[in-house]
Swiss-Prot record:
Residues 1-9, 67-69, 123-131, 187-189 are extracellular. GO terms for cellular component: membrane; plasma membrane. The chain crosses the membrane at residues 10-30, 46-66, 70-90, 102-122, 132-152, 166-186, 190-210. Disulfide bonds: none annotated. The lineage of its organism: Eukaryota, Viridiplantae, Streptophyta, Embryophyta, Tracheophyta. Residues 31-45, 91-101, 153-165, 211-265 are cytoplasmic. It comes from Oryza sativa subsp. japonica (Rice). PANTHER family: RAG1-ACTIVATING PROTEIN 1, SUGAR TRANSPORTER SWEET1. This is Bidirectional sugar transporter SWEET7b. The gene is SWEET7B.
Length: 265
């Protein structure tokens, strides 16, 4: 009989693979930034939030906090490195204002993590208490990260278009949340279950919206609009032209002559 721990590890490995794919999903965005040498209208906020989320989960999965969670450490450790690379690229091609903002946020996150690590290690002396404190923080920040697609979903409902909600990303997000929720339920880890369970719910909502609106993507309006045609109308216009006294018009003297012109409109 297959042991629950073996099944849990297998599910965790699959979860690592799927999560790795999710971490790599912004690569085209950063390729564009490097190519243009400008961050344009892209924001660093999602990557700063994900960086903090990864740091918390790495700390949570360490044996000194929550034993037997090495797979949580591996994928979030990889995610931490990837997010650091993204933020380095973003920093290099940002203006001074964005660089200053990023510096402040990164410093705040570093101080926050230092406070959490010191507070937990010095103030909590059992795995249960340490898991509780760090786990609650992971749930809070993980929920914020997973709820970010709500903005996109509201846009889909308003515009009735799934143009800015890629199907592949929604499917992978659903599978990722489902995988890690299953992993957490095998040995009931409520702190992994809650944010990933919400991730499954939000991804499922995206898939439902896609099924509803994928046929109703609004077509772009044709710039070459056909103007309404007007039938030509004949109109007589009289023009009065002065005539010199020396000129003879029909054998008589005249100071003006009237010319009829027909204009087609």
């Amino acid at each position: 009989m297959v042991s629950p721990d073996l099944i849990r590890n297998m599910v965790g490995i699959v979860g690592n693979i799927i999560s790795f794919g999710l971490f790599l999903s912004p690569v085209p965005t950063f390729y564009r930034i490097i190519k243009n040498k400008d961050v344009q209208d892209f924001k660093a906020d999602p990557y700063l939030a994900t960086l903090l989320n990864c740091m918390l989960w790495v700390f949570y999965g360490l044996p000194i906090v929550h034993p037997n969670s090495i797979l949580v450490v591996t994928i979030n450790g990889i995610g931490l490195v990837i997010e650091a690379v993204y933020l380095t690229i973003f920093f290099l091609f940002s203006d001074k204002k964005n660089k200053k903002k990023m510096g402040v946020v990164l410093a705040t996150e570093a101080l926050f993590m230092a406070a959490v690590v010191l507070g937990v290690l010095l103030g909590a002396h059992t795995h249960q208490r340490r898991s509780l404190i760090v786990g609650i923080l992971c749930v809070i920040f993980g929920t914020i990260m997973y709820s970010s697609p709500l903005t996109i979903m509201s846009q889909v409902v308003k515009t009735k278009s799934v143009e800015y909600m890629p199907l592949l990303l929604s499917v992978v997000s659903f599978l990722n949340g489902l995988c890690w929720t299953s992993y957490a339920l095998i040995r009931l880890d409520i702190f992994i279950t809650i944010p990933n369970g919400l991730g499954v719910l939000f991804a499922l909502m995206q898939l439902i919206l896609y099924a509803i609106y994928y046929r109703t993507i609004p077509k772009k309006q044709d710039k070459n609009l056909e103007l309404p045609t007007v039938a030509p109308v004949a109109k007589d216009t009289s023009i009065v032209t002065p005539v010199s006294k020396d000129d003879d018009v029909d054998g008589g003297n005249a100071s003006h002559v009237t010319i009829n012109i027909t204009i087609e409109l």
